[in-house]
UniProtKB/Swiss-Prot annotation:
The lineage of its organism: Eukaryota, Metazoa, Chordata, Craniata, Vertebrata. GO terms for biological process: response to corticosterone. PANTHER family: BPI FOLD-CONTAINING FAMILY B MEMBER 4, BPI FOLD-CONTAINING FAMILY B MEMBER 4-RELATED. It comes from the Eukaryota. Disulfide bonds: none annotated. InterPro entries: Bactericidal_perm-incr_a/b_dom (IPR017943), BPI_fold-BPI/LBP (IPR051660), Lipid-bd_serum_glycop_C (IPR001124). Induction: Down-regulated by dietary stress. Significantly decreased expression between days 0 to 5 in egg whites of eggs laid by corticosterone-fed hens (at protein level). Decreased expression at day 14 in the magnum of the oviduct in the corticosterone-fed laying hens. Expressed in developing retina and brain, but not in heart, liver or kidney. In brain, located in a narrow strip in the boundary between the ventricular zone (consisting of proliferating cells) and the intermediate zone (consisting of postmitotic, differentiating cells). Expressed in all major regions of the developing brain, including the myelencephalon, the mesencephalon, the telencephalon and the diencephalon. In the developing retina, expression is scattered across the retinal neural epithelium. Expressed in egg white (at protein level). This is Protein TENP. The keyword Magnesium does not apply. Pfam families: LBP_BPI_CETP_C (PF02886). SMART domains: BPI2. May play a role in the developmental transition from cell proliferation to cell differentiation during neurogenesis. It comes from Gallus gallus (Chicken).
Length: 440
């Protein structure tokens, strides 16, 4: 398949993929299978000639013939490497002229399809070639001629290839849903944009995507990844329908955007009061004549970074924690730099969303940044404030991402049998497709 998500244009670094995926031949087979009932409905409509304009209220039936029963005996999709798809359909009809035995008819359709990307960036499935054949299952010559006459009146073959891709389950609607705008938080959204038409190979259909993030409707210019993302060759024995790939840069850009949106500006409660803190830092007692609860106000002083290693994901955070008292008039008397050099991340998938939770802060250091109460040793800072920082910062970040992050997906399908595999620099998400119950 080659590099799936290689850097497309080094002159324009903003046109670099950070995620993508491949729909496997097994996934194509599943899409074909669930399209059968839909194809039968469409064929019932398209195989009939247009009803003549008349004022009669009596039911219309061409040439005294009952409308046919339609059964899609087979529908399949296969990849034509470097070209597109081949669609095959076998349709069985039973046409019943009045007062005669129903006549079996078989229609075979072979169509070549391809995907184009329009100037607006939307992908569209189009027909390259289509070849329908119609055959009446009659052994006698006289019956065959009669059958052909009836077929010409009943079966409108010309309509079959006008838009044969619509026999699949709303393919262009599904392609458009890939690039919908998805919410992350109430004022933060993400959108996946196709960088080029998909690549067709024996492994399936590969599509590279770039994620754009918005805050309050404005696109956030995220930092450019120093290393272009490319997806490795996939195992030929995969039993998945779809394999998604998300780069380390994708996750870092997500946290960068949330930080720019102010989502990680947090208030951390503390068990301390000004009186108890004055026992450790004596100058606090001179600032407050009454006992007030201590509050920690934290914000990121630089952008967070996600690090993906083989088998694990971690988050690096660099915060400034302002320590003070007073509500609603919060006044800080101490500022601390909190460097979280490793916070474990847990990744999972629910429906079509990536769920991200901060498991535990494994390594953190506190140091004095500014003080109105004299010099405070780092050891004392950690004794007083490290525990609430390590407990409350992950909880706050988990709450921000509690709804999960929408993965690239087609609107009529959900993901099942999902396995999230963390590799160095990227995450693979092999899964199977399942038609939503509202569409089944």
């Amino acid at each position: 398949m080659g590099a799936l998500l290689a850097l497309l244009d080094p002159v324009q670094p903003t046109r670099a993929p950070d995620c993508g995926g491949i729909l496997t031949p097994l996934g194509l087979s599943y899409l074909a299978e669930v399209s059968k009932p839909h194809a039968e409905v469409v064929l019932r409509q398209d195989l009939m000639p247009k009803e003549p304009q008349t004022c009669s209220l009596a039911p219309w039936s061409p040439a005294g013939t009952e409308l046919p029963a339609v059964k899609v005996a087979d529908l399949w999709l296969s990849v034509i490497p470097e070209a597109g798809l081949r669609l095959g359909i076998e349709v069985e009809l039973r046409i019943a002229p009045l007062h005669t035995v129903p006549m079996p008819v078989r229609i075979s359709i072979r169509a070549d399809l391809h995907v184009d990307m329009g100037p607006d960036g939307n992908l569209q499935l189009l027909t390259s070639a289509c070849r329908p054949t119609v055959q009446a299952q009659s052994t006698r010559e006289a019956e065959s001629k009669s059958s052909r006459s009836i077929l010409d009146k009943v079966v409108d073959v010309d309509k079959l290839c006008l838009d044969v891709s619509k026999l699949l389950l709303f393919p262009n609607e599904q392609l458009m849903s890939l690039t919908a705008l998805f919410p992350v938080t109430p004022n933060c959204q993400l959108q996946y944009l196709a960088l080029a038409a998909p690549v067709f190979s024996k492994q399936g259909i590969a599509l590279s995507l770039q994620t754009t993030f918005q805050v309050a409707g404005a696109v956030v210019p995220v930092p450019v990844s120093p290393v272009p993302f490319s997806m490795p060759e996939l195992a030929s024995t995969s039993t998945s329908h779809l394999i998604l790939a998300l780069s380390e840069h994708f996750y870092t850009s997500l946290y960068f955007t949330l930080e720019r949106a102010g989502a990680f500006n947090m208030t951390i409660p503390s068990m301390l009061t000004t009186a108890t803190l004055a026992q450790k830092i004596t100058q606090v007692g001179s600032l407050y004549h009454e006992d007030l609860p201590i509050t920690l106000s934290a914000a990121l002083r630089s952008s967070p970074r996600v690090v993906l290693e083989e088998g694990r994901a971690a988050l690096k955070l660099f915060l400034t924690v302002h320590i003070g008292a007073g509500s609603p008039d919060f006044q800080s008397f101490l500022s601390v730099s909190a460097d979280v050099t490793r916070a474990g991340l847990q990744l999972s998938v629910s429906d079509t969303r990536m769920m991200i939770s901060t498991a535990v802060i494994e390594d953190a250091e506190l140091s004095l940044a500014a003080s109105n109460v004299g010099l405070v040793r780092a050891a004392l800072l950690e004794e007083l404030f490290l525990a609430p920082v390590c407990q409350q910062v992950p909880a706050w970040m988990d709450d921000v991402l509690r709804e999960g992050v929408h993965l690239p997906h087609m609107s009529h399908f959900t993901y099942t049998d999902v396995n999230v595999v963390v590799h160095k620099d990227y995450v693979l998400v092999p899964c199977k497709l399942k038609l939503r119950s509202t569409m089944a």
